[in-house]
Amino acid sequence: MTLLTYSRLTGVWFLAVLATVWAIASWLLPVDGDLARVGGYAENDFGWRAPQTTFDKNLFHVTTDLKDYNRYYDVVLLGDSFSCDQESRRFGWQNYFINRTGLSMIVIDTRRYWPQEIMESEAFKKFPPKLFIFESVERYLHERVAYFSKETPPPKKASPTALEPLFATAKPLGVAPHEEAAKTKPGYDPDHVLGHLGAIFQRRTHLNNQVLEVPLAKPGLFSSPNDRDLLVYFDESRKKDLKESDFSDLRSGISVFQKIIESNGITKFVLLIAPDKTSSYAPYLKNPQDATVNLVAEVAKDPSLPVPRTDKILTEAIAAGIPDIYLSNDSHWGSHGHRLFAKAIADFLGAPDKN
């Protein structure tokens, strides 16, 4: 083979690859969901199609730097991706909660800061909030909370003054959300194509098993073209290893966590659990062994714990046939799921509802 022939063949090969990438780019929708992105699943198959209800701007402040927490907020929320990573979509549950209650809120990432760091911060001591919310996805709940069962809470201080009711002066904002259509135009992004193909290769060769495809027994639970399979993170199955003693430690840990937060005599504590897909959609899985334990129900065996039944309000909506309570391409909820999650805590706290 001459150098000229080799150069021509290389050029033809390069053009063929370029044409293939561009052809895929003209078909592949922009990446939207974390499960689709990590697992190498196309938004063309798993992207949501029904409109989602969004706000023009977020009503809460998220920080990844504790230095930003330097003034009074009615609510301090320490949470994970269900609270911190939903800003771009503008339908995070905090928007619905704040819109209904009028309370001010700062959101801090629990993947960066331990609860103890928040409690020991100058702002928390100087400007104690009316409400402290700890939010965790279900599959990481035990490791994030059960260890508190070994702690000894400090004695509760007497409040220096009569505590004002949580919603005494708060006024609903009355912001009107609006519907936003799904993005169904190709992204024409070669970098996305290469990343997508790389993720597919890793999944097919079992180099990356972070996302699992679980078959569903019931279609119509999602508005995506593929509504026959449930995408989930593999580590949802970690709950299958939990025993009754772990559930007991979890309940005890929540109780101690509450006593620690409320020891200042001012702040009320609530723990929010974001249920996993494999527990929320358990009745609709083709293989029952794919379902995982409902930790919200396990925690609720102690009715004294300040834990709203977020599981019930979500599963009731799923049973009613409302699609996209969770998004097919994502581990998080659609706008309706976020709204219901906000309703669960607002109702639990006795927030006025003028709607």
Annotated model-derived regions:
Residues 1-355:
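Extracellular glycan-modifying ectodomains
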